[in-house]
Amino acid sequence: AYYAEKIPQYDEDIRAGRRKLISYKEIRKAIFEVVEKYEIKVVCAHNSRFDVNAVNITQRYLTKSKYRYFLPYGLEVWDTMKMAQSVIFKQKRYKEFCKENGYMTKNNQCRKTAEILYRYISGNNEFIESHTGLEDVMIEKEILAYCFRQHKAMEKVLYPAPLPKPIEEEDIYCFEDYLKYL
């Protein structure tokens, strides 16, 4: 899954027009626009702590820590790994599936990767996760849907949305200032 191993594939996809290379600034701007346009209140990923940390660290690096957070303020972050912990990992059938297929950790715990969860819920034990963005999102949405179909109480939230922050005039200027860094 290491990124450097994917570079030839990304290069080919960019040349073929299947992917577009854009700046970090453009990515963040697009996310803000989509969140606002569709009034999105929640984002979700498998092991979302990794993703949130990665984008925040990149944000801090690029702006020399002047701007610390990548996602829009007030957006709640859900984690399908937490959800699966509540509703899938407790299933006797999932535990048997992991044991039968050698999907156990050295501490004899069932592994919790999106790839293994997708193998379990899809019945496709040959599935290999591509770790290339959109393709991964497509399996993570299946994990999310599967968790909701269980109709059980589950922990979802990585970070609850904070109370709405009043918009100050200085915030508008800060965002314009931020754009200079990218």
Predicted regions and their residues:
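Acidic two-metal-ion nuclease catalytic site recognized across multiple nuclease folds
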Residues: 99-109, 120-121, 127, 134-182
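Non-catalytic, well-ordered alpha-helical scaffold segments
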Residues: 29, 53, 78-81, 138-141
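Active-site-proximal helix-loop-helix substrate-binding element of RNase H-like nuclease domains
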Residues: 1-15, 80-137
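Glycine-rich, flexible loop segments associated with nucleotide phosphate handling
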Residues: 19-23, 27, 42, 69-76, ...
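Conserved non-catalytic scaffold segment of RNase H-like nuclease domains
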Residues: 1-58, 115
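Short helix-to-loop capping/linker segments positioned immediately adjacent to catalytic or ligand/cofactor-binding
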Residues: 39-45, 65-67, 125-131
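Hydrophobic residues within well-ordered, non-membrane alpha-helices that form the packing/core
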Residues: 35, 55, 59, 84, ...
